[in-house]
Amino acid sequence: MIGLLIITHETIGEAYRGLADHFFPNGFPENLHILGVQPDEDQNDIINNAIAALQEFPDNRGVLIMTDIFGATPCNAARRLVRENKSAILIGLNAPMMIKAIQYSSQAENLSDFTETVKEAAIRGIFAITSAPEDLVCKEHG
């Protein structure tokens, strides 16, 4: 099992908890912890809180840390927690990333492979639609 730690600005992570509840109605996964960073929070306090969260995970195959914005405080704190084969980071948290991570973390055995799989899900979940589909027809209600 791979542990999952989400470190985001304020309540963004909690919004993702709600999304997880929607997709996984049998309960919030035990291997997922969320840490919300406050605007005035000290960097060392953030790191200490993250270390405490990491220590709550059972002896497992590593922890994937997901953060929201590259270069921002949550990301900078998380970068200090990376340890080869023990923890990795994905930055740019989105819904497909989180759903894939939750869906497969319990059976994942290799942190590096798992991280790449989750990253690919995040990338494949992004689309740009710049024009209306040609077959879109609105029906009149009558």
Can you name each region flagged by the protein language model?
Residues 2-64, 70-142:
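N-terminal loops that bind phosphate or other acidic moieties
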